[in-house]
Amino acid sequence: MACVSEAIGLALPYSAGTPAPYTQRDSYALKSGKAVMNLLAKNIRPRDIVTKKSLENAATIVAATGGSTNAALHLPALANEAGIKFDLMDVARIFKKTPYLADLKPGGKYVAKDMWLSLIHI
């Protein structure tokens, strides 16, 4: 689910998946605070950022990583709050067509930290 906040545009790239004990989290916290203040100064709100496309991206990330099926409920709920037409059938369609790319826990072999480490070394 950490990937979801990045996929919908509400977290800085690589920030949400950073493991808790890593010092990079401090840097992301500072950068995130600055980004939020910049967005507020420009009167940009979450509803200006979250779109149907970003929700589709989030569902795709969840499906590709074997992520939480709770996303099938949370993403449509978020869409509803934002006034975006995106429901469980949209999530199901995306889950059905998206290949499974990362064998992550809870059902898989690897933990989210492993994916984060692979991404920061690209």
PLM feature segments, named:
Residues 3-107, 111, 117:
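Accessory "access/gating" subregions that flank catalytic or transport cores
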Residues 120-122:
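Conserved small/polar residues in nucleotide/adenosyl-binding loops
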